[in-house]
UniProtKB/Swiss-Prot annotation:
Higher taxonomy: Bacteria, Bacillati, Actinomycetota, Actinomycetes, Micromonosporales
Pathway(s) this gene product operates in, as recorded in its UniProt entry: Cofactor biosynthesis; (R)-pantothenate biosynthesis; beta-alanine from L-aspartate: step 1/1
UniProt binding sites for substrate: 57, 73-75
Signal peptide as annotated in the record: none
Protein name: Aspartate 1-decarboxylase
């Protein structure tokens, strides 16, 4: 049986540009692609932390060291410069391999510079997490 598992994640990157008229895809600094083990053309999900939008596209390499995260094509209607995003890639692994697999997790700062690598996928790197969103139903659940 194959399991679809988290393979790569670039956490809380800042969108630096958007080009509605580009053919499509997301442009990502080559340093971030290398750190996250993402290849040009690889499918990624983009989760917009700022507005909740989710979409799928593929990556194209951007200039190394530039910090570029560029949203291209129709996705520019959903994701805008300055938005915080999470880029996620999944892989299919055999059950035994999946049980021991460690994904590549890349935490970045506001300039999209790497601040932490291969941390626990469920733990934010120091200084990268925002304030928790309050649960509006918390009082009624108590």
């Amino acid at each position: 049986m194959l399991r679809t598992m988290l393979k790569s994640k670039i956490h809380r990157a800042t969108v630096t540009q958007a080009d509605l008229h580009y053919v499509g895809s997301v442009t990502v600094d080559q340093d971030l692609l290398d750190a996250a083990d993402l290849l040009p053309g690889e499918q990624v999900a983009i989760v917009d932390v700022t507005n909740g939008a989710r979409l799928e596209t593929y990556v194209i390499p951007g200039r190394r060291g530039s910090g570029v995260i560029g949203i291209n094509g129709a996705a520019a209607h959903l994701v805008h410069p300055g938005d915080l995003v999470i880029l996620i890639a999944y892989g299919q692994l055999e059950d035994a391999q999946a049980r021991g697999y460690q994904p590549r997790i890349v935490h970045v700062d506001s300039g999209n510079r790497i601040v932490d690598l291969n941390a626990d996928a469920a733990t934010a790197a120091p200084g990268t997490a925002g304030a928790p969103v309050p649960n509006p139903l918390a009082d009624s659940l108590a």
